Design a protein with these regions (language model features):
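Short glycine-/acidic-enriched loop or helix-start segments at secondary-structure transitions
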Residues: 41-42, 66, 115-118, 139-140, ...
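Conserved beta-strand signature within the Rossmann-like core of class I S-adenosyl-L-methionine
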Residues: 125-134
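A short, conserved alpha-helix within the catalytic core of class I
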Residues: 111-123
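Rossmann-like AdoMet/SAM-dependent catalytic core
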Residues: 1-24, 31, 39, 93, ...
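SAM cofactor-binding core of SAM-dependent methyltransferases
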Residues: 3-107, 134-137, 224-228
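Short, structured coil segments at secondary-structure junctions
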Residues: 49-50, 123-124, 176
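Short, catalytically relevant binding-site loops at active-site mouths
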Residues: 111-113, 134-137, 188
């Protein structure tokens, strides 16, 4: 267990530090999309420990004023970009704000993450962290539709229908020249390594036997219609959103279907 939480939401700080040591990567330059005010994020630990170049992106009011006060901002080269990212602007935003080789790319916007990754060039970074939705389980190969301005709590009141399934994410990342090495303990952030770092050399001890090991999460963050927590667990989470429409990506399709149609 290498998970250590310093500034990350869970144990991503420890995982990243371990991966950089394993890959023998000296630079720690990063791009992170979906950072909020940056107090709890996947790359803040890297920034404050190693002072690399970085780009953080989110769409919150007074973002710079909220981020700068608690950082030793002068110690590293951090660009703060206030932008609502979608599949149409992602490449332009990266090209305009990132003038360095990316060592770690992190994406977590609880939204159309699949469609944003789909637009990225292959092998954009050495390490890639992407959030997935464990509620979709291990077998479904789905994502929410590519809706402009997608909001998780608006698409379904339960807050459970967002993002993509782990299986869909892994297949997409394989097309982008990465391989999957596992997730955090909470089972919502997947870690991928560029094929430039051969699995046989760096992670020959890792064997992915079943995706169930990365989707059976005990997180209970579901909401009632009045926005109070409903604490759904197990199969009840997927049952709650069975009427929601998702894109079925199985067999290279992109069919818009209700989740319940995929469960029958």
């Amino acid at each position: 267990d290498v998970e250590v939480k310093v500034f990350s939401q869970n144990g991503e700080d420890g995982i990243l530090d371990c991966l950089f040591n394993k890959l023998k990567v000296d630079s720690k330059n990063f791009v992170e999309i979906g950072v909020g005010d940056y107090r709890e994020s996947n790359t803040r630990f890297l920034y404050q420990k190693y002072h690399p170049k970085g780009l953080i992106i989110d769409y919150i009011d007074d973002m710079e004023k909220k981020v700068k006060p608690f950082l030793n901002f002068w110690k590293g080269d951090l660009t703060i970009c206030k932008k609502k990212i979608d599949s149409k602007n992602i490449l332009d935003v990266i090209n305009k704000n990132c003038n360095f080789e990316i060592d770690v790319f992190s994406l977590d916007i609880d939204s159309i993450d699949y469609w944003i990754i789909d637009e990225l060039k292959p092998n954009i970074s050495k390490i890639f962290i992407a959030e997935y939705n464990h509620v979709f389980g291990s077998e479904l190969e789905v994502t929410v539709p590519n809706i402009s301005g997608f909001e998780r709590n608006s698409y379904h009141y339960s807050n459970l229908c967002y993002g993509m399934s782990l299986k869909a994410l892994i297949k997409l990342m394989e097309k982008k020249d990465y391989y999957f090495i596992g997730s955090n303990v909470q089972k919502n952030n997947a870690f991928f390594i560029s094929n430039d770092f051969k699995k046989e050399k760096f992670f020959n001890n890792i064997e992915i036997k079943s995706l169930d090991n990365y989707t059976n999460s005990n997180i209970r963050e579901s909401l009632n219609k009045d926005s109070s927590l409903s604490y759904l667990s197990g199969d009840k989470k997927l049952k709650e959103i069975e009427e929601c429409k998702v894109i079925n990506l199985k067999d290279n399709k992109k069919d818009l279907v209700k989740i319940k149609e995929l469960l029958s």
